[in-house]
């Protein structure tokens, strides 16, 4: 019986040390952060847990999660570049965000015109879309996109479903055509 109790206490101690840190889908590998500014990163950990955030460009921040486990930090970002960066978020366990770029972030939102992907819909093809998709790997290090799933809400949301994507032949067909042509033009103008 003593061995069983000792084992249970040991397992409880291991579980408490292995606290989980979670992030919303909008904060992840392959994301782009706005250059030369203070960006907010947030997530969830155990209630009242210490959270440390460190970026490969030298920025660091720490916070303590609130009673519901939510935390938020602000990081200073450097000038934009195409050099991939890394962000580590730690609170018990560790989340590593790889292949993060620093540059220009633009939100493209709307209805059917904005939603039309480069791959087109059914009979609706995008002029030049197939060529862009075929050559998309050339833009892999320059353009990223986050396709947020359809949803609605009447209050601000901390979590929205979606994931950051590099612009590649495998992902380009899902990217908004309008957003792509804007990003490509902006990339040429700013370089």
Locate predicted features:
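Cell-envelope and extracellular/periplasmic
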Residues: 19-191
